[in-house]
């Protein structure tokens, strides 16, 4: 079977030892930092562009700086809590202190999304500003962070795809990745992280940019948020067909790792969590156009 060897890239950019402890800067952490900084600059540019708004930007630059702290907390706390509740609740109920070990990995986008949503609502209520226009700004600035995060997933050799015989299949390191039932030798897999980087990052960013800068969708509160939710939900739903499900869902009787199954068909946990996003996104877009 032909495959592409996994590139020899360390998950750690560099590490230092201080007082007997090792501290490392990982690509995943850098992706979070860079994504937040790029998103902040994009929101700042949209706030400063008067032509995008009918009655002016929904918040000031000073408010944006304060919001950034709330968003960071929402992403980290929501992402970790979402992983604990959605993917491994039984493990963390038995070992609750493991939920604090964020350095061991385990973040959920859907949980991070809910965390940011709660943070934005709380911030807007405190600052007495409209929620939907602020949500539109953050939605427009999110795809670059998603792109970088998925690239970091690839570098970390995690969240790889299902087995494939396609010529661009990648032989990810590790016995779990390279051993597949019914396949002799090294098992090549879909580089599903790169599929998601392209769809959730590049394609979704391009669509939102056109809607904002060419179509003026920021004048309709909630429209950009709806487009982001529906776009991300569709992208994630599609990629789930070739993405290897989380190990806790895979059993001998359920090799596809379906979280819900009926009549031989079913959905993965990622697809189940994406469907409400798609429906909510469609609702926001329809609501925005009706109230325009």
From Swiss-Prot:
Cross-referenced InterPro entries? Lgt
Query: Which residues fall in a coiled-coil region?
Result: none
Q: What is its EC number?
A: 2.5.1.145
Gene Ontology cellular-component terms for this entry are: plasma membrane
Q: What does this protein do?
A: Catalyzes the transfer of the diacylglyceryl group from phosphatidylglycerol to the sulfhydryl group of the N-terminal cysteine of a prolipoprotein, the first step in the formation of mature lipoproteins.
The GO terms this record gives for MF are: phosphatidylglycerol-prolipoprotein diacylglyceryl transferase activity
Swiss-Prot/TrEMBL GO biological process terms: lipoprotein biosynthetic process
* Membrane topology qualifier: Multi-pass membrane protein
Q: Where does a 1,2-diacyl-sn-glycero-3-phospho-(1'-sn-glycerol) bind?
A: 150
- One Pfam family for this entry, by name? LGT
Membrane-spanning residues: 18-38, 67-87, 105-125, 129-149, 193-213, 222-242, 266-286
* Pathway of action: Protein modification; lipoprotein biosynthesis (diacylglyceryl transfer)
Cellular compartment(s) = Cell inner membrane
User: Is the Transcription keyword given for this protein?
Assistant: no
Q: What is this protein called?
A: Phosphatidylglycerol--prolipoprotein diacylglyceryl transferase
Q: What class of enzyme is it?
A: transferase
Q: Is Membrane one of the keywords?
A: yes
Q: What is the lineage of its organism?
A: Bacteria, Pseudomonadati, Pseudomonadota, Alphaproteobacteria, Rhodobacterales
Instruction: Identify the main location.
Output: membrane
Species name for this entry? Answer: Cereibacter sphaeroides (strain ATCC 17025 / ATH 2.4.3)
Keywords associated with the record: Cell inner membrane, Cell membrane, Membrane, Transferase, Transmembrane, Transmembrane helix
Indicate the family of this protein: Belongs to the Lgt family.
